[in-house]
Amino acid sequence: EGRTTLLGPDIEQATRAREQRLAAPRERLLQAVASGELLIRTRGSAVGQVNGLSVQPIGDQAFVQPARITATARLGEGQLIDIQRETALGGSIHSKGVLILSGYLASRYSARRPLSLAASLVLEQTYGRIEGDSASLAELCALISALSGVELRQGLAVTGSVDQHGAVQAIGAVNEKIEGFFDLCVGQGLSGEQGVVIPAGNASQLMLKEELIAAVESDRFSVHAVSHVDEALALLTGWPAGDPALGANAQTVNGRVMARLREFHELRREQAGARRWPAPGLAGAGETEP
């Protein structure tokens, strides 16, 4: 139009054009969730399960697909199994992110004794290669939920990477991720309990569509910026995160993790003691039962 300056209507028009290009894959996603083909929950709560947000390139556009991240935890010897890596579906940066989680768990919860834990992580219903560490905050929250037994809100999706001290780090495509989950929630019906947890470092980059802003202003959707995993846990659980340095405490998330790991440690000690001696009646020839 001969102008050299972009105005608000120009940006809105470009945004609508992008929305139209992504309409078909978005509609397929909504149908898959509605039919139960893709198991994504945006209501209720669950242990060891949280919604992450993955970005799929479509031409020059980024299409966001929610990814259900699940974790399990059991007695073990410090193993954290990255199922994406074990099946050659995880890239090196994603694998690095999972190794960072292992370091965080060991240093924060088990610095003075062996980590008596075996855990596994996977992005469910993903069949292509996963790269990047932007799911590591969600993965850590799922792991801590599995360990503590505290449920996570399924209406909150989580994006962000973490370092070995639990600090939440900025990620890419933050606007697309928020809007992608918002569109899914609109398709299922906004409940007022849905939203997205993002790194505080991304807050200055937000440029969201008007429909989403209106939903936030009317308390039908929310965007939460966090700087540490403990803040994300408090939002997802409704529990105080607590300080693991204070030991086992059934009233906080981290206190319950400490209690579970102490239980695992005692079980390992008992099993190690039982292996030291043969069971009664099973002494070998020339041996005397204790």
Model-derived segments and their meaning:
Residues 48-60:
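Structured beta-strand/loop patches that form or line metal/cofactor-binding pockets in enzymes
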Residues 62-66:
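Short, flexible loop/turn motifs enriched in small residues
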Residues 30, 34-42, 46-51, 67, ...:
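Peripheral, non-AAA+ core regions of ATP-driven protein-machinery
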Residues 2-36, 194-200:
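Conserved C-terminal helix/linker of AAA+ ATPases
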